[in-house]
From Swiss-Prot:
Residues 29-75 form the F-box domain. This is F-box protein GID2. Pathway: Protein modification; protein ubiquitination. Its main location: nucleus. Keywords: Gibberellin signaling pathway, Nucleus, Ubl conjugation pathway. PANTHER family: F-BOX PROTEIN (PTHR47750:SF7), F-BOX PROTEIN SNE (PTHR47750). Residues 1-27 are annotated as: Disordered. It comes from Arabidopsis thaliana. Expressed in all tissues tested, including rosette leaves, green siliques, flowers, stems, cauline leaves and seedlings. InterPro entries: F-box-like_dom_sf, F-box_dom, SNE/GID2. GO terms for biological process: gibberellic acid mediated signaling pathway; protein ubiquitination; regulation of gibberellic acid mediated signaling pathway; seed dormancy process; seed germination. CDD domains: F-box_AtGID2-like (cd22151). Essential component of the SCF-type E3 ligase complex, SCF(GID2), a complex that positively regulates the gibberellin signaling pathway. Upon gibberellin treatment, the SCF(GID2) complex mediates the ubiquitination and subsequent degradation of DELLA proteins (GAI, RGA and RGL2), some repressors of the gibberellin pathway, leading to activate the pathway.
Amino acid sequence: MKRSTTDSDLAGDAHNETNKKMKSTEEEEIGFSNLDENLVYEVLKHVDAKTLAMSSCVSKIWHKTAQDERLWELICTRHWTNIGCGQNQLRSVVLALGGFRRLHSLYLWPLSKPNPRARFGKDELKLTLSLLSIRYYEKMSFTKRPLPESK
């Protein structure tokens, strides 16, 4: 004997259908953040410090990978050609002092920020305009002008 369909059964089927769609969408979204740690490491070793720091917010695996001292060492030493000591010696000193991530966040990152534009006060502005007008006045040639006649 077949069971008769009721309105609640139809509503339940529609609800199940939307749940299936949501689950499949979630699975698609989760796929990118579940990359292999080695693959994530290979990608992250080519990014800048800001991108590396932001990537740690993607997932737990990405966070763990972004905390890797080897990645921060690459970022810190990327632009240093010759620092006067060997790579292993540098690594041992920096790791003893807290690591490359700490070195970057406390010392290198503040230096890499552009300085804010200097704002002139009234005195500086007046002095600059005065010097400009003096230079302009000196460059004027008065020899070509006739002198005013005195009466």
